Design a protein with these regions (language model features):
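Exposed, interaction-prone extracellular/peripheral surfaces
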Residues: 1-164
Length: 164
C-alpha cells in the first residue's frame, strides 16, 4: 500500500514539474535527492521496487539527519501506520516547527488485518480507539493526517481529506 501511494504522490508532483525527493528507511536510510522529470520518476520507482517493510530506525533520527537537506517550507509526506515508533510525535513537531507542511498518509493496518483475519470485535474496537488517539495526537502537532482505510482507493482518501 505505502509504496504504491509514494509512487502515485511523487508522480503527481513530478507532472507539475516540482522537484521530488524520496526517503525510505528501515535498518538503514536511503535518500534520493530532489530532482524533476522522467528520469527522477524512474529513479523513484526503482527505489520503491526494492523497499522492504521492517527495520528499527526511529523517524526522528531520519528527520534529524535530513533536516539540512529539506528546503524550508517544502511539503513533507510521511507514509506510515504510526505504530511502534515513540519518536513520531517529536519528529512531526520539529518538521512543522521548521515551517514544513507535514502530510501524514496513514494506512490502517488494523483494518487491513481485520479484512484478512478474524479479530475479535472488542479487540478491534480497542485497537481502533488507540489508533484514533495516535492520529489525533499527530494532528495536534500540526500535521494534516489522512486515515487511509484499505478498502478505499488512494485517490478517494486524498480527495476526502481536502475538506478536513
Amino acid at each position: 500500500m505505502g509504496t504504491a501511494a509514494a509512487a502515485s504522490i511523487s508522480n503527481h508532483f513530478l507532472k507539475r514539474k516540482d522537484s521530488v525527493s524520496l526517503v525510505t528507511y528501515g535498518d538503514k536510510l536511503d535518500f534520493l535527492p530532489a530532482d524533476t522529470g522522467d528520469k527522477q520518476h524512474y529513479k523513484i520507482l526503482s527505489r520503491l521496487a526494492s523497499v522492504a517493510a521492517g527495520g528499527s530506525m526511529p523517524l526522528q533520527a531520519v528527520t534529524n539527519s535530513l533536516a539540512p537537506r529539506i528546503s524550508r517550507g517544502s511539503p513533507v509526506f510521511i507514509i506510515s501506520s504510526l505504530e511502534g515508533d515513540g519518536t513520531t510525535l517529536p519528529a512531526i513537531r520539529n518538521l512543522s516547527g521548521n515551517g514544513h507542511e507535514v502530510i501524514v498518509l496513514s494506512p490502517s493496518s488494523i483494518d487491513l488485518e481485520r479484512l484478512v483475519s478474524r479479530i475479535p470485535r472488542m479487540s478491534y474496537e480497542v485497537l481502533k480507539l488507540e489508533r484514533q488517539n495516535r492520529l489525533t495526537a499527530v494532528s495536534g502537532y500540526g500535521a494534516k493526517v489522512i486515515d487511509w482505510m484499505p478498502e478505499v482507493e488512494l485517490s478517494q482518501a486524498l480527495l476526502g481529506s481536502r475538506g478536513t
